[in-house]
């Protein structure tokens, strides 16, 4: 099992990071909370989780061990796969997710793409006890730090990032269109668009 990878960020295309580890490039899918901390050429440590299926092997990477633990905990919930777990961690900070579960806030959870009312209720029931020990987390304000994207189009980058979370193209376009006039950087557009969709 690959527990973590230490290397240099070679390329970024939300939500995937290409990490150069001693000349070998690893494609790693990350939540936006991790992705938005990375810059091309940066040396980083990503805490990883490997998912093996019949047709593919996929690495998921996280900026810290706690986020990886939360991801693995989410995967234990019936009906939650890696894509949904990644979407949850991209939309909600660890702190907000724990708070949401502790306070039975179904309305916040159903705003995550792919999470319906039944899934949200199942998450509440199955995670309540497990999350009691996870009171500390990343603050929601710091969930999407600054990033420098390679693309010349911040709007296109933001739309692609939102679609990677599971939002429909039209939903992503509308959310980005509503906030793009106020921002010039992709990360700022993503952050504002996510906030607008969580209202």
Swiss-Prot record:
Report the locations given in the UniProt record.
Cytoplasm
Q: What is known of its domains?
A: Has three domains with a flexible linker between the domains II and III and assumes an 'L' shape. Domain III is highly mobile and contacts RuvB.
Per the record, which residues fall in region Domain II? 64-142
Region: Domain I, residue numbers: 1-63
Instruction: Show the GO MF annotations.
Output: ATP binding; four-way junction DNA binding; four-way junction helicase activity
Write out the ranges of the annotated region (Flexible linker): 143-150
Gene of this entry: ruvA
The entry's function note states:
The RuvA-RuvB-RuvC complex processes Holliday junction (HJ) DNA during genetic recombination and DNA repair, while the RuvA-RuvB complex plays an important role in the rescue of blocked DNA replication forks via replication fork reversal (RFR). RuvA specifically binds to HJ cruciform DNA, conferring on it an open structure. The RuvB hexamer acts as an ATP-dependent pump, pulling dsDNA into and through the RuvAB complex. HJ branch migration allows RuvC to scan DNA until it finds its consensus sequence, where it cleaves and resolves the cruciform DNA.
Name of this protein: Holliday junction branch migration complex subunit RuvA
Record-annotated membrane-spanning stretches: none
Q: Per the record's keyword annotation, is DNA-binding included, yes or no?
A: yes
């Amino acid at each position: 099992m690959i527990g973590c990878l230490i290397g240099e960020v070679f390329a970024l295309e939300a939500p995937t990071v290409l990490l150069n580890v001693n000349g070998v490039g690893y494609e790693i899918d990350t939540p936006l909370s991790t992705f938005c901390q990375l810059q091309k050429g940066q040396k980083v440590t990503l805490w990883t989780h490997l998912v093996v299926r019949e047709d593919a092997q996929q690495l998921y990477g996280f900026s810290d061990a706690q986020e990886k633990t939360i991801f693995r905990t989410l995967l234990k919930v019936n009906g939650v796969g890696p894509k949904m777990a990644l979407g949850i961690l991209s939309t909600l900070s660890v702190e907000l997710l724990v708070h949401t579960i502790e306070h039975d806030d179904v309305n916040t959870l159903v705003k995550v793409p792919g999470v319906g009312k039944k899934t949200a209720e199942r998450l509440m029931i199955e995670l309540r006890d497990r999350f009691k020990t996870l009171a500390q987390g990343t603050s929601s304000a710091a969930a999407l730090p600054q990033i420098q994207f390679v693309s010349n189009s911040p709007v296109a980058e933001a739309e692609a990032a939102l679609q990677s979370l599971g939002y429909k193209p039209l939903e992503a376009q509308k959310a980005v269109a509503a906030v793009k006039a106020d921002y010039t950087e992709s990360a700022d557009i993503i952050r504002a668009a996510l906030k607008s969709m969580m209202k």
